A protein has these predicted regions:
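Active-site-adjacent pocket scaffolds in enzyme catalytic domains
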Residues: 1-83
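C-terminal domain-boundary segment and adjacent tail
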Residues: 61-141
């Protein structure tokens, strides 16, 4: 209710998965829904096991596995809602001063950029369209 009262039209912060000490949203819907005046657009998870397809997953999973999980979400939901942070694509992520764990830095910077481009090319070849959240949900300005 607070988000709608503040003028927001959608909430895309729901991760419908279970991650120890972070999320326990296994009962949350995986597709677009409505709640308290807001459109809920959850982050994509695989089917049927709800493996999160968020930014960490692309870092740590082999691309063929990530694609397989994306395919399962596409079949169930008809869309993917993926998010990444700009800093993940920086080569500076590997610098000790940033204190980022090695499991994230081994595929960051240009390595992650290349992996991401291959993912986008694969999605495009499958006929996927790329839209902003606002376009996909049909939210007015």
């Amino acid at each position: 209710a607070a988000l709608a009262a503040a003028g927001y039209r959608y909430n895309s912060s729901i991760n419908p998965t279970w991650i120890p000490t972070r999320y326990n949203n296994l009962r949350a819907p995986c597709s677009v829904s409505r709640e308290e005046g807001l459109t809920i657009y959850p982050v994509s998870v695989s089917a049927p096991f709800r493996v999160p397809l968020f930014w960490i997953s692309l870092h740590v999973m082999p691309l063929p596995l990530y694609k397989l999980l994306c395919r399962s979400a596409l079949r169930r939901d008809g869309h993917l809602n993926l998010y990444f942070h700009p800093w993940e694509f920086s080569a500076r992520l590997r610098e000790p001063a940033f204190g980022v764990p090695g499991y994230l830095t081994h595929c960051s910077g240009t390595d992650l950029q290349r992996k991401f481009i291959r993912l986008l090319e694969w999605l495009k070849a499958r006929g996927c369209r790329f839209l902003t959240t606002r376009e996909y949900l049909g939210c007015d300005e």
